[in-house]
UniProtKB/Swiss-Prot annotation:
InterPro entries named in the record: FAD/NAD-bd_sf, MQO
Gene: mqo
Biological processes annotated in GO: tricarboxylic acid cycle
EC identifiers of the protein: 1.1.5.4
Family: Belongs to the MQO family.
HAMAP family: MQO
Top-level class of the enzyme under EC nomenclature: oxidoreductase
Name listed for the protein in its UniProt record: Probable malate:quinone oxidoreductase
Cofactors required: FAD
Length: 496
């Protein structure tokens, strides 16, 4: 234990949330809505909220609802197209909309500051991929969640959907697309700051910026002590509950916590790059989120997409992502992050995961040696008439892909994962996509795993029902409930 006096009441909290990104801010708002008197501390190493992975330019994609992302409907070894992930993510995103709608109804969120309605489109080329898209359309559109999905191979109709993409394209080219008009683009940086703005004036909440968590330890009675190093002062704080929502930085803090569950994990960082266009002639013409299909052998993170994005209220086009490599676990982290994370408990898992993912290694190597001309050539598959000078390369945020020790050895996992201590006193979020778009569902999982007794109480149950009118209902199997909650969400978020 730290050789310091026991923290006084001023330095004792009901919950300490590390990181002021979309995850911690979502959890902070949820806890404050459920019990306003809870003493919460949010600790952020940067100078403001939402500057790392939650920042709009650092996001690999937003508004993930499985409307257009083909990697959420993978083809199995037996040729079967699996839709389980698509329905799971669609339901999770609807829950995010439901939460935002409830806060908007209370006057605590202004939808137009972070949310824009935007069609979601899947676009493919050639007979084989068109056949796959038809199969996806057939399976998804037969269910209420995706009933509004449209399919076309008609060049005239496609020119109406995506005029910039169809400009200069040969009429003989085989191309197909699906579209769902009820899509969105989310500025998660602005949303994060909106969350923080609504709670930072509360007497029960402290937010410390430019403050780093140097270490954390648990005492014999289950309390956590965190050593904080700030720009203004250093201090020791205490809490019954800690959430590590520091993006790529969560892994190193999880390792410092020394909980047995954390020994199962390692991480592999992948940086991202975007081609960005701010030219009005292009941004006015393209108005959609358009996802293609990853090349054979390429990982899901490589799915190319051309997105209309509103970043700090300015409309831009982003194409990518292109992968890069940095040993940082955070964009504003240290080059030593990866090396410091290697322990005797996870080294074998990392080596095994590397051997089992040779294709990923080849993909990353090819990405690293790409020139800007190579990237523009990739963009030309989407935009035959592209003007290269209109597009600038920008570095996005860092992703730390999970490597987990399982009964089969070290496994590289592409999604997100909540890790909790056996006593529920600590939770950490690891991983990447779909991330921010499903933050609400992920944080409800944290509450159910770490605040179970409170979640069972009538007080919290009633509050949850107030925030989530559909809670307890499977909207994927109850069409009437799905349509009702979508009608409410669309009205309150002004998506109609």
């Amino acid at each position: 234990m730290f050789n310091t006096p026991t923290p006084d009441s001023e330095n004792t909290y009901d919950a300490i949330l590390v990181g002021a990104g979309i995850m911690s801010s979502t959890l902070a708002v949820l806890l404050h809505e459920l019990e306003p008197d809870l003493r919460l501390l949010v600790v952020e190493k940067l100078s403001s909220a939402g500057l790392e992975s939650s920042c709009a330019k650092n996001n690999a994609g937003t508004g993930h609802a499985a409307n257009c992302e083909l990697n959420y409907t993978p083809i199995q070894e037996d040729g079967h197209l699996s839709t389980n992930k698509a329905f799971e993510i669609n339901k999770s995103f609807e829950q995010s909309l439901e939460f935002w709608a409830s806060l908007a109804e209370k006057g605590k969120l202004i939808p137009k500051t972070f949310l824009n309605k935007l069609p979601h489109i899947s676009l493919v080329f050639g007979d084989e991929d068109i056949s796959l898209l038809k199969k996806r359309f057939s399976k998804l559109s037969s269910h209420a969640a995706f009933a509004e999905m449209e399919f076309t191979m008609d060049h005239g109709e496609l020119k109406d959907w995506v005029p910039l993409i169809m400009d200069g394209r040969q009429h003989s080219e085989k191309i197909a697309a699906t579209r769902i008009k009820r899509g969105t683009d989310i500025d998660f940086g602005n949303l994060t700051r909106s969350y923080i703005n609504q709670i930072e004036g509360a007497k029960s909440i402290d937010i410390n910026y430019s403050t780093n968590v140097e270490n954390l330890q648990q005492d014999s009675e289950g309390d956590w002590y965190l050593s904080l190093e700030g720009a203004k002062n250093n201090r020791i704080v205490r809490s019954k509950f800690v959430f590590l929502g520091a993006g790529g930085g969560a892994l190193s803090l999880l390792q410092k916590s020394r909980i047995p569950e954390g020994l199962l994990y390692a991480g592999f960082p992948v940086s991202g790059k975007w081609l960005i266009c701010d030219e009005e002639k292009s941004t006015k013409t393209h108005n959609a989120k358009v996802y293609g299909k990853a090349a054979v052998g390429a990982p899901p993170m490589s799915v190319p997409h051309l997105d209309t994005r509103w970043i700090d209220k300015k409309k831009s086009l982003l194409f990518g992502p292109f992968a890069g490599f940095s040993s940082n676990f955070l964009k504003y982290g240290s080059k030593l992050d990866l090396f410091r994370s290697i322990k005797t408990t996870n080294l074998f898992s990392m080596l095994q995961a590397g051997l089992d993912n040779i294709d990923l290694g080849k993909y990353l190597l090819n990405q690293l040696i790409q020139t800007n001309e190579d990237r523009i050539d990739t963009l030309k598959r989407f935009l035959p008439q592209v003007s290269p000078n209109d597009w600038k390369l920008s570095t996005a945020g860092q992703r730390v892909q999970i490597i987990k020790q399982t009964s089969k050895g070290g496994v590289l996992k592409m999604g997100t994962e909540v890790v909790t201590s056996s006593d529920g006193s600590l939770a950490a979020l690891l991983g990447a996509s779909p991330g921010a778009s499903t933050a609400v569902t992920i944080m409800i999982e944290v509450l159910n795993r770490c605040w179970l007794e409170k979640m069972k109480s009538s007080k919290w149950k009633n509050k949850m029902l107030e925030l989530f009118p559909s809670i307890g209902t499977d909207i994927n199997s109850d069409q009437e409930a799905l349509l009702a909650i979508r009608k409410r969400n669309d009205f309150l978020l002004k998506l109609i």
